[in-house]
């Protein structure tokens, strides 16, 4: 289903990012690319989905085949009929302003009948219980909500291959569980999945193998059953995060002295975006003392990024 042997160097780089990297992924398998940032995961996906060399310039050698077809002579559109892609930053793949139109965009470009397009769009939002995101301005959505729209867009294309580049980078826990259900559904349908990830816990029961990359090479290919048995020390050597959230512990930190001065004070902050009826922020108040670390947590769209932009003066 996916077969490749690739080396690649970006046009402005002296050293290759991928060093004659090879792999074969049979139909219906889910492979997870792991490794530290900069090891070549995203570059490999770009080589497979055609963005390299058609968008990112550089020197590429080797081959890539999807469903037995060599992608070397294909346009990005032709590759898109075989494989759907989800990128780290959903804004980089949006072509419309309306969320429903975005999910329909790929189907329209492949010439499907309007009735079929509308059916697929409605089904995508309904199956994954995301009706609240229909007909929304994508630039008024949170980063996590935009990522969900990009995932629905890929799902609606109904290709045999799905390529996902760190799809949970902007997702909260609940949205990550939604993505897990989407991937489960695709796996049951016999789709082939290749994704790069740092978070691994949600892929239990979905991933068949974990391929660990380092310096543009695949250092090891580990079946899911073997990876689950890794000790914390083994995972640390391989730069793998935990596969089980129950293993995570949070050490207690010493309390700050009461005399430590405040360095940030937020008092009764409210904010409403233009064209929105409801407030994004309402009555937010807190203070931060010197050397104190505060984590803002909450569901996608609750206002975390908006609050950060207000504090930064953006």
Please state what every model-predicted region is.
Residues 137-141, 145:
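Conserved ABC ATPase signature
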Residues 34-36, 297-299:
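The feature captures the beta-strand-to-loop junction immediately N-terminal to the Walker
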Residues 115-133:
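Conserved ABC ATPase "signature" region
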Residues 151:
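Hydrophobic anchor residue at the start of the ABC signature
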Residues 154-155:
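ABC ATPase C-loop
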Residues 162-165:
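Catalytic Walker B motif of ABC-type/P-loop ATPase nucleotide-binding domains
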Residues 197-198:
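H-loop/switch region of ABC-family ATPase nucleotide-binding domains
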Residues 63-78:
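ABC ATPase NBD Q-loop/coupling interface
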């Amino acid at each position: 289903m996916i077969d490749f042997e690739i080396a690649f160097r970006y046009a402005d780089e002296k050293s290759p990012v991928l060093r004659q990297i090879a792999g074969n992924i049979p139909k219906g398998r889910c492979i997870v690319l792991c490794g530290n940032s900069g090891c070549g995961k995203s570059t490999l996906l770009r080589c497979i989905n055609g963005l390299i060399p058609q968008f990112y310039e550089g020197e590429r050698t080797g081959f890539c085949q999807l469903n037995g077809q060599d992608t070397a002579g294909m346009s990005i559109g032709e590759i898109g009929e075989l494989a759907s892609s989800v990128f780290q930053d959903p804004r980089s793949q949006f072509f419309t302003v309306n969320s429903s139109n975005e999910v329909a965009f790929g189907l329209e470009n492949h010439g499907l009948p309007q009735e079929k397009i509308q059916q697929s769009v409605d089904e995508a939002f309904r199956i994954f219980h995301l009706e609240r995101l229909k007909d929304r301005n994508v630039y008024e959505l949170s980063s996590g909500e935009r990522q969900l729209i990009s995932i629905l867009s890929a799902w609606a294309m109904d290709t045999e291959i799905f390529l996902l580049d760190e799809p949970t980078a902007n997702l909260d826990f609940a949205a990550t569980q939604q993505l897990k259900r989407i991937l489960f559904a695709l796996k049951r349908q016999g789709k082939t999945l290749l994704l790069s990830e740092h978070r691994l816990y949600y892929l239990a029961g979905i991933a068949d193998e974990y391929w660990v990359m380092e310096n543009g090479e695949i250092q090891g290919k580990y079946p899911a059953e073997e990876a689950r048995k890794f000790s914390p020390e083994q995972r640390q050597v391989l730069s793998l995060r935990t596969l089980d959230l129950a293993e995570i512990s949070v050490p207690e930190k010493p309390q700050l002295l009461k005399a430590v001065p405040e360095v940030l004070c937020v008092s009764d902050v409210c904010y409403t975006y233009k064209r929105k009826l409801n407030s994004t922020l309402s009555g937010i108040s807190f203070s931060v003392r010197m050397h104190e670390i505060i984590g803002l947590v909450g569901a996608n769209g609750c206002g975390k990024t908006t609050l950060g932009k207000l504090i930064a003066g953006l």
